[in-house]
Amino acid sequence: MLIHPPVSKPCEPPAGIARLAGYLEAQGVSCDLIDANSEGFRFLFGPALRFEEVGSPGRRGMYPAAEGRSERVKAPGETTAERNLTNLDTWTRRAMRNLDRHLRDLRSSPLYSQPDRYRRAIADLGRILACLPYRREVVLGLADYQDGELSPVRSRDLLAAAGHPEKNPFYPYFISGLAPRLAVVAPPLAIGISLNYLSQALCAFAMIGFLRTRHPQTRIVLGGGLVTSWLRRPHARDPFDGLVDNLVAGPGEEFLLNLAKNCGSGIREGGHHSGGGEIWDTMVSRDDNRKPAARSIQAPAYDMTVVHDTTAIHSDLVSHDAPVSRVCWSDNGAASGRAGLADNGPGPGWTGAEARPEVVSSCPDYRAFPGELYLAPGPILPYSAAAGCWWRRCRFCPETAERNPYRPLPAEKVFADLDRLTKEMNPALIHFLDNAMSPALLAALARHPVGVPWYGFARITEQLAAPKFCRRLRDSGCIMLKLGLESGDQRVLDALDKGIDLKTASRVLWSLKAAGIAAYVYLLFGTPAEDREAARRTVEFVAAHSTAIGFLNIALFNLPAFAAAVSGLATRTFSDGDLSLYVDFDHPRGWSRREVRRFLAGEVKRHPAIAAILRRTPPVFTSNHAPFTAMG
């Protein structure tokens, strides 16, 4: 069983566990999938919160505020007596009265062409979540989860969340939604949790604690992007011994397959025998020259080659024969001495990729996720045409620091998958998840339209500066491209090794605008190379191109911990969390975080041209809903 935990945006099915399920099913291994994030939100917004009219409570009703906190909605699953809704404030009563309509409207297209109604719907749902009666230290939103007492970057706090799952807002869902799913069949031999965002961490560990109590013999496997980043930090260790049986860094397909093949009777280490067969915590033996990446984290060595295939979008790359580890698994090439790309990455014209023999690739399986589970005007199909990044030169990029190889799929594989998935899902939108869609992939899509609107992240290149090519992209279904401009100052871009020329960026924005493709532009302020004047040049660039920029994401730079030693900057601990991925630093130009925040609040977000872009950028769901806004 594979589970996607809360909290992340409940607008599209989880691609990670769908990819794993597709691979396992192709190898003859059955696998159940649960999107506990979207199911959890559906439970919180469920029948327990309904009422017929203002002042007339529903069957479960509402109750007024606990002392010291604003009025709250009664938690699903509780048995507190009904209270009159007139005790609630006007906003909450209105939000409750319109709850069904908001949920219905967010699943239909017309709302996305009405910005005021859309913002009201999102704000009202956020109000309801804010008023649910959990601990006052908890702030729950549609895309975020914060706890004033527990930090997602402190392992002891994650263990505390696991020790008291009843304190988590999703605990009623664990009891009434998740537990019955596990009870209908025999307990699974293993449960995999896919943890990708910090907003998921505390809820994921609360869920793990709940599952460990209910199913002590079941093996718990924890993987995903966030876990990979944790394990690939210098001197990484396993802080969850005794709670989590396996930590998986990097792609988990081979690990899970070997686990399924070698699990025997399904006995967890320290558990009780559940039937015949051998104890399955024994490591699969093979002479693979394993070297420790860190204490109790192991990585296999691979025979790597570089393959240049001009007939495909990319070359295949899939690991093979991965052993099962007792504690942690990593496919980290840096630790094992694996051959790979040079540190400076491939050049702009590079078309090849690292490749492994014995290519195995499977189509993701989204059949377990009904479209009505998600807050979107139609099913969204998430799809990865490649793992890693074809550029791999940007300073402070984790793809380079973690030595993630570029692992693309061939053209025929991409189009075969998309053809199959569009027939199965009838999607309203395809979301390409690639870190950066390669020029070859974009060209292939321009030549072979997939018949469904699509969007994704792309680098600013000469290819996108060509008006004719952009028109072909639009004709192929491209609705929006996300562009990491980062800065409007050429010196800053060069210092970051972005490979972006501002003159080219200008032509790209105008070409996309002329073709009818929305540009979702990402800006990053406070980098070590930036000062106030450089930041002002960014503001000037954005203002000058404001009519060509559809949406904006404005972020404050954080220095990754992996870059601290080589940055040449004076650094200090960003937080006391042992799992923190960032450090604080003394800005070499005196451009402190406090000054940057003031600049963003005063000169950036209040600039009339930029403020207009921010107003049309969807709140909370941001780039996930922006394509629907762009389609009008």
Residue ranges and their predicted role:
Residues 7-51, 60-81, 114, 121, ...:
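Glycine-rich beta-alpha loop elements in corrinoid/cobalamin-binding modules
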Residues 375-412:
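Canonical Radical SAM [4Fe-4S] cluster-binding loop centered on the CxxxCxxC motif
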Residues 2-3, 7, 11, 19-21, ...:
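C-terminal accessory regions of radical SAM enzymes
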Residues 197, 226-228, 401, 436-438, ...:
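Active-site-proximal loop/turn and secondary-structure-junction residues that shape catalytic pockets
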Residues 1-4, 217-221, 415-519, 525:
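Conserved SAM/AdoMet-binding glycine-rich loop
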Residues 236-258, 476-479, 537-559:
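Structural recognition of alpha->loop->beta junctions
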Residues 24, 389, 483:
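Conserved, mostly hydrophobic/aromatic
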Residues 27-29, 185, 424-425, 508-519, ...:
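A structural motif corresponding to the C-terminal end of an alpha-helix
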